[in-house]
């Protein structure tokens, strides 16, 4: 029996019309008036998106990614992205994943909470400044005192208004932590980067590159990336998971999800295959440069959660009545 070779498409934008238990029925804008079938709910391919299909509405924009087309013209995508022009922040999406589980409600809870000028956020900003100083140090070693003076010039209001720093003991602990992160970044950039297992070249790096990924409907900013996109680092000044395994420190779930999404962004926006990427989580507290790996099934689960958030946002706008939001 002759095997028919399936056609493959990287990305396809379609309009949703309706669905049944096995297929979506869609139209390709500006092509023709033909209705196409999209197979969903296939185990190991796109089953992660099945429970969102009832949330789709007529005329919704969908991105179909990594699509195979069989001999009958039926589309079978690996990703189904609802309203991809709604660019969700990667950090906000990753925060839906907590130690106790994940839920789209975490996204809305975070949006309703006031933004606090808290110690962890301030420490993270200062740690990013330390990274800048060590990466761009050209022939001289950054001085801690001079760098902290720069931090005071850059964050004067935040430092003055942080309630945690009004207590003398907490203030001392904060600046002790600043010194610790400075020293750890010094060791990481000057020594760990040069180790054979990492091979990181700070002279050919970009700090804080921003990306918009329309295929997946997300956007974000990395902390460190090699110019050839072979390697990137996401830095965290907080604690890792110290409890799941008593013998080692592991990345927290939200941090791990963040890395998955950055890998997907580089693949779909920059055509950099995830198999060739070397992503690392840098926990400056320890310090620990942790290699992060992923499976596409995990990424699909995160994008599926994104779809549920987008569907809720659009539902609130379209209904605009308390009977829907109660």
Task: Mark where each language-model region is.
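Mg2+/Mn2+-dependent nuclease catalytic core
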Residues: 28-57, 200-314
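Short, amphipathic alpha-helical segments that act as regulatory/interfacial helices
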Residues: 124-135, 263, 267
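Flexible glycine-rich surface loops and low-complexity tracts that mediate binding to linear polymers
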Residues: 51-77
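A residue-level signal for conserved active-site and pocket-lining positions in enzyme catalytic cores
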Residues: 99, 127-128, 224, 262
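Structural detector for short beta-strands of small beta-barrel domains
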Residues: 1-30
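Cysteine-cluster motifs in flexible loop/terminal segments that predominantly coordinate metals
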Residues: 99-103, 317-326
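A non-catalytic, helix-rich entry segment at domain boundaries
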Residues: 130-207
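Extended, charge-rich, solvent-exposed interface segments
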Residues: 74-123, 129
């Amino acid at each position: 029996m002759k095997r028919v070779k399936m056609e493959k498409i990287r990305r396809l934008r379609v309009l949703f019309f309706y669905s049944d238990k096995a297929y979506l029925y869609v139209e390709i804008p500006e092509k023709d008036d033909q209705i196409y079938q999209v197979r969903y709910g296939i185990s190991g391919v796109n089953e992660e998106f099945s429970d969102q299909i009832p949330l789709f509405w007529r005329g919704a924009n969908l991105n179909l990614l990594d699509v195979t087309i069989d001999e009958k013209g039926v589309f079978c995508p690996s990703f189904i992205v609802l309203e991809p022009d709604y660019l969700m922040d990667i950090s906000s999406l990753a925060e839906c994943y907590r130690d106790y589980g994940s839920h789209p409600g975490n996204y809305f809870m975070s949006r309703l909470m006031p933004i606090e000028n808290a110690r962890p956020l301030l420490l993270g900003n200062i740690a990013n400044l330390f990274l800048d100083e060590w990466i761009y140090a050209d022939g001289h070693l950054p001085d801690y005192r001079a760098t902290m003076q720069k931090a005071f010039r850059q964050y004067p209001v935040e430092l003055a208004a942080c309630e945690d720093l009004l207590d003398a003991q907490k203030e001392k602990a904060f600046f002790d932590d600043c010194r610790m992160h400075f020293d750890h970044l010094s060791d990481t950039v000057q020594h760990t980067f040069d180790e054979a297992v990492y091979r990181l070249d700070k002279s050919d790096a970009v700090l804080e590159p921003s990306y918009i990924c329309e295929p997946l409907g997300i956007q974000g900013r990395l902390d460190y990336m090699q110019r050839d996109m072979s390697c990137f680092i996401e830095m965290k000044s907080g604690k890792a998971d110290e409890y799941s395994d008593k013998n080692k420190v592991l990345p927290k779930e939200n941090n791990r999800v963040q890395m998955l999404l950055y890998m997907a962004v580089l693949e779909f926006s920059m055509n950099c295959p995830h198999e060739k990427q070397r992503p690392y989580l840098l926990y400056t507290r320890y310090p620990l440069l942790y290699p992060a790996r992923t499976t596409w099934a995990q990424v699909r689960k995160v994008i599926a959660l994104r779809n549920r958030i987008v569907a809720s946002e659009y539902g609130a706008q379209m209904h605009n009545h308390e009977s829907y939001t109660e």
